[in-house]
Amino acid sequence: MEIQYNWKTKLFSNRFEIYQNDIMKGEVDKERWSRKVSGELNARRVLFETKGVFKYETLITDLQGNLPLGNVKYTPWKAKSVILYQNKEYRWQFDNLLRSKWSISDENGVLIKYHSHALTGIIVSYTRDEILILTGFFIRNFLKQKSAEIAATS
């Protein structure tokens, strides 16, 4: 079953709103001056906390029970990542050179597809797992932020 969400943000905003049929269903919000990002989708709440300096790892925590759910490990070139979640491995990757399309897949194929266009975008999911949907969205925004930081220091 295909589920579609739309998302939007504002220029220089740390907050992304997620909609389904024009009804707000969730958000992803980065705390200022912090490595913590909270996300919510359909009442499922999660915290992403990134550790490391050159080799990053993100811990995924369920905010309802404050339980660890998994983590994200990034490749050195930051074009692919591995999500370890519920004792299963998922692959996250950019799907085009512009980095405006990305996806999450498992051994059976693509589970979630994302597409961005400036300050808006679409999420098409073939799973109802809100945590996995939010994780894929978080990873792209984390890598985009890291790329911007590198460009700013160059």
Regions found by a protein language model. Give the residues of each.
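Low-complexity or membrane-interfacial segments used for flexible interactions
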Residues: M1-R35, L41-A43, L67-L69, Y74-S154
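Short, well-structured hydrophobic secondary-structure segments
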Residues: K36-G65
